[in-house]
Amino acid sequence: MKKVILTGDRPTGRLHVGHYVGSLSERVRLQNSGDYDEIYIMIADAQALTDNAEHPEKVRQNIIQVALDYLACGIDPEKSTIFIQSMVPELTELTFYYMNLVTVARVQRNPTVKSEIKMRNFEASIPVGFFCYPISQAADITAFRATTVPVGEDQMPMIEQCKEIVHKFNSVYGETLTDPQIVLPSNKACLRLPGIDGKAKMSKSLGNCIYLSDEADVVKKKVMSMFTDPNHLRVQDPGKVEGNPVFIYLDAFCKDEYFAEFLPDYQNLDELKEHYQRGGLGDVKVKKFLNKVLEAELGPIRERRKMWEQRIPDVYDILQAGSEVAEKKAAETLNDVREALKINYFDGDFALN
């Protein structure tokens, strides 16, 4: 069996550092490992329209922004197929067939769906398309016969529901779909990066993000305004590192070599945490260090993005070529699904009498 990756993002805005540590950096690592036969990276515009139906121009504008972020982070179109979801109509048809295998009650129990509904204040006014998001995602994953899906922690319930659909389909219609496996970031701090305001999730809609494309001065301003331990009022006060966004970001981004370069008074992050916990280390000093760490990580990404911004026609070509490759792959799976459902009425031995 081929080893295949499928992953992607909704084009509702530029990508942020939560995307980077939660999934993007892992995609680049897996892409460059040479361990996978095919890699598909989807710009999920159709899914983005489920809660932006009245503002399609927002989705359209952000397709290029997301593509630029992908390329800037190191996604290589020679190794990975970058495509636009709506350019692969087979995904919509697969979604429709899978809907028959899932109950409304099951979708309502999906923790990701529940949290997204609450965050957007949908309640009873939830669009049907948004409600069916987990089923659409299952179509995306199975269409490319993905064996591996690198995701952030918040997407785990979606992948679990996809696996349920795969098992149900295969048990009813015969072995047809590939059962995907989840890959989470190895660094636990990367599972879910909090917002700079200390809220549980960094989110474009909450406005608490550091974007990959933010200029250095913007990143610095955001870092210096970050939420920390509210009880750490004076430098000499003992501070708390658990749940402290500044230290969570350092857990996610910091490398030992950054101490030698930016903060030689400490050997590693454990020493810095120890000092903060016993008192005598101010938030400003820690934030300044975090800002230098982020600049070391984001600076090269920002420069590559600026280079690609000068090559927008090439970015369009990459997306068009990738979408064509993706459609061919999805068409193969859809044909197998139709055959399993016995609805390929005019094909060979299955033709209507």
Enumerate the predicted regions with their spans.
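Extreme N-terminus of proteins, especially the signal/transit-peptide cleavage junction
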Residues: M1-K3, F346-D347
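Short alpha-helical patches at coil-to-helix transitions and adjacent helical residues
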Residues: Y20, L24, L91, Q155, ...
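Conserved nucleotide- and phosphate/pyrophosphate-binding catalytic cores
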Residues: P157, K163-N353
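Internal, conserved structured core segments that host functional sites
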Residues: P111-S115, M119-F169, Y173, P194-G195
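N-terminal Rossmann-like or analogous alpha/beta NTP/dinucleotide-binding catalytic cores
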Residues: K2-A139, E257, A296-L298, R305-K306
